[in-house]
Each structure stands twice: as structure tokens, then as C-alpha cells.
Amino acid sequence: MATELEYESVLCVKPDVSVYRIPPRASNRGYRASDWKLDQPDWTGRLRITSKGKTAYIKLEDKVSGELFAQAPVEQYPGIAVETVTDSSRYFVIRIQDGTGRSAFIGIGFTDRGDAFDFNVSLQDHFKWVKQESEISKESQEMDARPKLDLGFKEGQTIKLCIGNITNKKGGASKPRTARGGGLSLLPPPPGGKVTIPPPSSSVAISNHVTPPPIPKSNHGGSDADILLDLDSPAPVTTPAPTPVSVSNDLWGDFSTASSSVPNQAPQPSNWVQF
């Protein structure tokens, strides 16, 4: 049934070919085209190469009517069905057969060397394809003969899959994570870098900075507490008067009021030596 489903395909067509009756080969040295009557061909016509399955057919047909003159089945190339001559690349010896099984060897030749090249390549490509198909079929048979790997679950065997962002039975649909801080995220500082804080503006610095009132010193001495206070307190630092700002007039007024309200303490004699 496989033979009935095979179709015939055309591999090559050459409109001009000459057929020669060749003498029998006397030795195993091969055929020579110079032994033929090249100027007097026995038949001229058209050559067509077809394939059906793995077998190629060289058909010699009439140029006008297409009637079949002879046919040469080729099951292997290179082989006995098609041979090249030893003294030219344009001539070949083929084995023709009829329907009864009888066979004969004849010579064929092409006027153009390119036609002879196409004839040779068409047969080579066909049997190269046949070889590849045989290798693929052999590999598939070997694969079928190997024991198949059972990847199915055994009875009672289960697996557990943990996939994120999928509705589960208990908690329902998982909520996507949101960024903290109102959706704004800050990038971390670069490694080894230092973060510097910009200095405040001049107006803010003047309004927020208040110089503490100086503590008056007594040269004649006082109580023990006053002497200790003098040792601990740093020397007064004279600061230049800032540029008057309209915004901070009230603050300076409060400071002057507070400094004037401090009473002067009377110096008291003491046995401590003042440094």
C-alpha cells in the first residue's frame, strides 16, 4: 500500500541528448567515448529524470510526441546503472531495462557540458536525500525500541507548588505590597559617601541665635558660690553687633530688658584666691 501512495517527481529535464550503441567492454579499464561513433548518434531526443520513492528513473523520450524510447531505473549512484567514461565528462553509460526484465548498456552524451553537470548533480542530490531518510528512519526505530521513561504520578503521589500573587483558600487574594511614606521611596546613600546638611539662611540664623548675657565679675571678691561660678564660666566673648533686621527688633528688646533687670550683687570678702 505504501507503493501506491508514492508519487512521481521530476528531478531534471534536458531537451537534447544523443544515444550511442557501444561495443562490449573488453577489460575492466572502463568505457571510453572515443571508441564510439560520436559523429553518428543512433538516436537523439529528450532526457528526463524522475523519482518515485527511493528509485530514480532516466527516461529517454521523443522531443515532439513525448513517447518513451527507453528507461533506466537507478537504485544506487554511483553504481552499475550509471557509469562515467574515462576520457570525457559529457558522456555516460546507462543500463536500460524493459518491462520483461531484459537489460542493455547504451551510451548517452550531451552537447553542452553544463547539461552533463546537471545530470550528474540531480542523481547525487536524490540519493543523498535517500540516505538521510534512511538514517532518520533508523534513529526513530531505535528510539521506539528503547524503554520509555515513565514521568507520570504514581498512585497517591502529590506535589506542592508555592506561587506568589495567587488566590489561596484561606487568605484570599494576596494584596500587592505598597511603598511606605506615601508612595515615595528614597534611594540609599552611595557607599562611603557623606551626607552634608546645607547651612541655614541668614535670616533664620539671626532670628534664632540669642547670645547669653555676660555674668559680671567682681575684682574685690564675693561669696564662695560666686568664686566657683567665676572659675566655671568662660571668659566673655565680644560679638559684633548684627545688622539690624526689622523682624528681630522685638527679640533684642526683650534681651536688653532681661539683662537690665538682673540686680548687681555686692561683693563679699572671701579667703579664696581668685584666678
From Swiss-Prot:
Sequence motif WXXF motif 1, residues: 252-255
Fetch the CDD domains from UniProt: PHear_NECAP
Give the chief site where it resides.
membrane
Q: Where in the cell is it found?
A: Cytoplasmic vesicle, Clathrin-coated vesicle membrane; Cell membrane
Record flagged with keyword Manganese? no
Q: Which Pfam families match?
A: DUF1681
Task: Cite the domain annotation text.
Answer: The WXXF motifs mediate binding of accessory proteins to the ear-domain of AP-1, GGAs and AP-2 through hydrophobic interactions. Selective binding to the GAE domains of AP-1 or to the alpha-ear domain of AP-2 is tuned by the acidic context surrounding the motif and the properties of the second residue of the motif itself. The WXXF motif 1, which is preceded by an acidic residue and has a glycine in second position mediates specific interaction with AP-1. The WXXF motif 2, which is followed by the C-terminal carboxyl group negative charge, allows specific interaction with AP-2.
What is the recorded name of this protein? Answer: Adaptin ear-binding coat-associated protein 1
Q: Which organism is it from?
A: Homo sapiens (Human)
